[in-house]
Amino acid sequence: MDKLSKEQRHKNMAAIHSKDTKPEMIVRRGLWKRGFRYRLNHKRLPGHPDLVLKKYRTCIFVNGCFWHGHNVMYDVRCKTEEIIESSECCKIPKTNREFWVNKIRRNKERDKEEQRKLAAMGWHCITVWECELKPSKREETLESIAFTLNHIWLQDHQPRITAYPQQNEEDMQMPMAAEGDVV
């Protein structure tokens, strides 16, 4: 049974927003401080990524561990939709469990499909989890994002080396700059 009344639960759930969340603001400020520029919630791209860095052809999704099922796996051995919680960052509620399991499963499937579409369009995707932005891990996570973005840029802008076609022995004879053999 739920510990909160129906009205209290409704109020809590209504207060949850999908834009300008605390984890998203941490990532935005961290990237801005490191010199990265981005657009927010790009409507024309699948999944409306939280941050879009066009220069790097990269989309960043800042996901809440609960809503996107971080470290939640489904037990394929069971015929029913049994869920295995493998970390503390995503605990499935005991009340209305079937609803939450299905909701999180659909969210994970949707996320995977959106990232597949973005990859097909030539975009790179980075997912940042809410638990990776805890104070003890925050700087390491932000440095990792910056490193990944720089790596992507270097890969996409490395010089292209073109191999020249092989030539026949006859074609390779160089013209003489001096006089030929004197007889």
Regions found by a protein language model. Give the residues of each.
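Nucleic-acid endo/exonuclease domains
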Residues: 1-127, 131-183
